[in-house]
Amino acid sequence: MINIPRGTQDILPNETKKWRFIEARLDELMEVYNYQEIRTPIFESTELFARGVGDSTDVVQKEMYTFKDKGDRSITLRPEGTAAVVRSYIENKMQGLPNQPIKLYYNGPMFRYERKQKGRYRQFTQFGVEAIGAENPGVDAEVLAMAMHIYQSFGLKHLKLVINSIGDIDSRHEYNEALVKHFEPVIGDFCSDCQSRLHTNPMRILDCKIDKDKEAVKTAPRITEFLNETSKQYYADVKQHLDDLGVPYVEDPNLVRGLDYYTHTAFELMIDNPNYDGAITTLCGGGRYNGLLELLDGPHQTGIGFALSIERLLLALDEENIELDTEHDFDLFIVTMGEEADRYAVKLLNDLRRNGVKADKDYLQRKVKGQMKQADRLNANYTIVIGEQELQENKINVKNMQTGESESVDLDKLVNYFKK
């Protein structure tokens, strides 16, 4: 037997109902916030992610699915959404559109070769938003508040918004120099990943998950000590907007994002619930990227966004025992007796469906009792039984499965009956 690839999953019909519910809710919220959907290819040039995500990141060095196509071009299955959206923004000259900033959202499969763990897959579904074309603390606050709104709309509680400022490029450069100076004498005691990051991306050392390295990081200088006046004021304005919006937050000066293109605002949305085992603590993350477009040969434009995993959202809902309203009414199940009635039901079904009536029938030649059980399993609102007598008299009893009451209807008027 051929099995599913490691790190992937089949989403079966009972689960796809939840997915459709979530995706519909997200679409509705994006309309409220005036964000438009964008769809980009599942694979892109490897160079896009090497430049846009960063050569020194774990994503590029360890996690990407990269291959040569038949034209000997290096292609990568997208590991994240921002770089592709920005590439599309540049390529399609969206900076020339009148409705600035451009507010976009996406939803689709991403691919990373990660260690299998709870809530993480090698193919996962990422939803994300990008607001490109406005460097304004109000936009940052809107995006952070939107992230909180999304999770609250599903009934999740125990949410904690963690924020930090990484500063502008000048502040980051000065801070990175201070980190190198701080860690260089003791870097030999750190894990191999941290050792390789010292001179390529020292801020990533702050995000190390190794316990002994975490302890050593506590004595490192903090980015807040190196923010210039511009960065300090921008961060203060973002926090003021969040206060005005009534969005609670916690500051963490060691919060950094795993990708190289972030500047100024960085944030994560977490579950702050003692019942969790820590596997799904972080639900969502993002931040501002003011140099990414130019890094990809685009115009001098700024952006901010975030991304979340649908799989981890579903896991969080399960952990908090939140049931999604995925039950949909099923209008009618047709029970048949005999070949002539069965043939008639096929045509009747077609007429009903073409008029928007959700209907089905039995195709396994079950007895009447078995067909009625199938109607129950489908949660049909109504059933009818068609046999020789019903065909001859052109009369049918429409049974309400909730009340048990029946109403006599002309068989040739059944479609109009359900269209009411």
Swiss-Prot record:
Organism taxonomic ancestry: Bacteria, Bacillati, Bacillota, Bacilli, Bacillales
Protein name (Swiss-Prot/TrEMBL): Histidine--tRNA ligase
Gene: hisS
EC number: 6.1.1.21
Subcellular localization: Cytoplasm
CDD domains linked to this entry: HisRS-like_core (cd00773), HisRS_anticodon (cd00859)
One BP annotation, GO: histidyl-tRNA aminoacylation
Gene Ontology molecular functions: ATP binding; catalytic activity, acting on a protein; histidine-tRNA ligase activity; transferase activity
Family annotation (Gene3D superfamilies): Anticodon-binding domain, Bira Bifunctional Protein, Domain 2
Cross-referenced InterPro entries: aa-tRNA-synth_II, aa-tRNA-synth_II/BPL/LPL, Anticodon-bd, Anticodon-bd_dom_sf, His-tRNA-ligase, HisRS-like_core, HisRS/HisZ, HisRS_anticodon
A GO cellular component annotation in the UniProt record: cytoplasm
Catalytic activity: tRNA(His) + L-histidine + ATP = L-histidyl-tRNA(His) + AMP + diphosphate + H(+)
Database matches in HAMAP family: His_tRNA_synth
Subunit structure as annotated in this protein's UniProt entry: Homodimer.
